[in-house]
């Protein structure tokens, strides 16, 4: 056979081998990322990077390879399709709502339900009017805000809820349709700050406890892992500093959980706020044990809440992680939950409707 003809005949096979090899590599990359994300998580600094990075970026190799594979090799297209599915569903934490079942206990208290809205308002900027309009649209009974110092509260917020019970403490702002008062503050030594405030609310069905939470962001630790630092002579020091910040964050989370347990005393309790921690984090289950996450139980889709500003590689208005949560103890059924769609703050709000299934004490 003519050598040139033989070479031309082998060219398609070479391309096929290359595309298959790259497709397997892309699938392996996604699998390794998932193992790092869910198996390692914040137990190691590289897992923490995976936890707080925009996970959609992991799709890049498969998104490039898929259209090529569709023309050259269907098996390779299948591999890339599987990789895309794994990222879109598992890595990005897509949720389907679980069926709601009303309980016999709920009828004992007349099916008392309420709507709660929680959100970090970034000191009432950059577009609090949009955020406030979204709050109003949910028709809430309770509002729990973070990074909301009372001294900077806009007149529009005060006017909107002038006939409500308002409770403030450091950065926390709570509004209730029902009588409410502060029970205690959770001051943590890890960052020398208030990380939560507990409010007792007298509802028509009895008293309940709302804990408004704002724990430390991982961002300051991740700043230490800039490539210029990590791949320098000071790399080990940068990693050690990041791990120290992470350890203090986890200590703060544990302190807030101890605070919640002490305050609630088995009463009907809702814990809401900016946890700066996603459910996929290895630190989150230790905090949320015994509580149900409203979005996980009844939310639809991704529900990403942060960051909405231009602090990361994605454009403003495209959050990639869900770090704002509403948790309830066993006294409640979750009717529905959703996250906001506006970009009035650097976080989107979370709204949940919950129904009391045990008489409040």
Report the location of each language-model feature:
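Conserved beta-strand segments of alpha/beta enzyme cores
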Residues: 115, 163-165, 209, 292-293, ...
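Metal-dependent phosphoester-hydrolase catalytic domains
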Residues: 12-71, 78-81, 200, 258-270, ...
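Structural signal for conserved beta-strand scaffold positions within catalytic alpha/beta enzyme cores
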Residues: 118, 168, 212, 293-296
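Active-site beta-strand/loop signature of hydrolases that rely on acidic residues for catalysis
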Residues: 50, 115-121, 131-154, 176, ...
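N-terminal, active-site-proximal structural segment of metallo-dependent hydrolase catalytic domains
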Residues: 2-158, 358-361
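Short, glycine/charged-enriched secondary-structure capping and boundary segments
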Residues: 130-133, 157-160, 225-226, 284-288, ...
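Structured beta-strand-rich core segments of catalytic domains in phosphoester-bond hydrolases
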Residues: 89-109, 123, 127, 142, ...
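A solvent-exposed, charged loop/short amphipathic helix patch at secondary-structure junctions
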Residues: 224-243
């Amino acid at each position: 056979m003519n050598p040139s003809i033989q070479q031309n005949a082998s060219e398609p096979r070479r391309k096929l081998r290359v595309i298959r090899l790259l497709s397997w590599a892309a699938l392996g990359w996604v699998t390794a990322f998932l193992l790092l994300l869910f198996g390692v998580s914040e137990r190691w600094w590289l897992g923490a990077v995976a936890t707080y990075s925009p996970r959609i970026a992991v799709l890049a190799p498969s998104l490039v390879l898929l259209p090529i594979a569709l023309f050259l090799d269907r098996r390779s297209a299948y591999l890339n399709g599987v990789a895309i599915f794994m990222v879109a569903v598992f890595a990005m934490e897509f949720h389907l709502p679980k069926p709601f079942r009303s309980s016999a206990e709920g009828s004992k208290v007349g099916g008392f339900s309420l709507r709660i809205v929680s959100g970090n308002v970034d000191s009432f900027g950059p577009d609090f009017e949009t955020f406030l309009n979204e709050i109003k649209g949910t028709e809430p009974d309770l509002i729990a805000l973070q990074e909301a110092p009372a001294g900077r509260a806009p007149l529009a917020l005060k006017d909107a809820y002038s006939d409500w019970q308002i409770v403030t403490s450091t950065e926390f702002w709570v509004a209730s349709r029902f009588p409410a008062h502060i029970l205690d503050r959770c001051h943590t030594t890890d960052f020398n700050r208030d990380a939560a405030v507990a409010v007792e609310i007298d509802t028509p069905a009895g008293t309940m406890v709302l804990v408004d939470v704002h724990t430390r962001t991982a961002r300051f630790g991740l700043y230490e892992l800039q490539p210029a630092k990590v791949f320098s002579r000071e790399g080990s020091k940068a990693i050690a500093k990041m791990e120290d910040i992470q350890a203090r964050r986890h200590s703060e989370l544990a302190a807030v959980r101890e605070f919640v347990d002490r305050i609630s005393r088995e009463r009907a309790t809702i814990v809401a706020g900016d946890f700066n921690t996603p459910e996929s984090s290895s630190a989150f289950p230790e905090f949320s044990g015994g509580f149900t996450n409203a979005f996980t139980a009844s939310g639809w889709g991704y529900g990403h809440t942060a960051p909405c500003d231009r602090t990361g590689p994605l454009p403003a208005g495209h959050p990639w992680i869900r770090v704002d949560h509403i948790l309830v103890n066993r006294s409640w059924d979750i009717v529905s939950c959703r996250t906001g769609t506006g970009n009035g703050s650097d976080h989107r709000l979370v709204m949940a409707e919950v129904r009391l299934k045990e008489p409040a004490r």
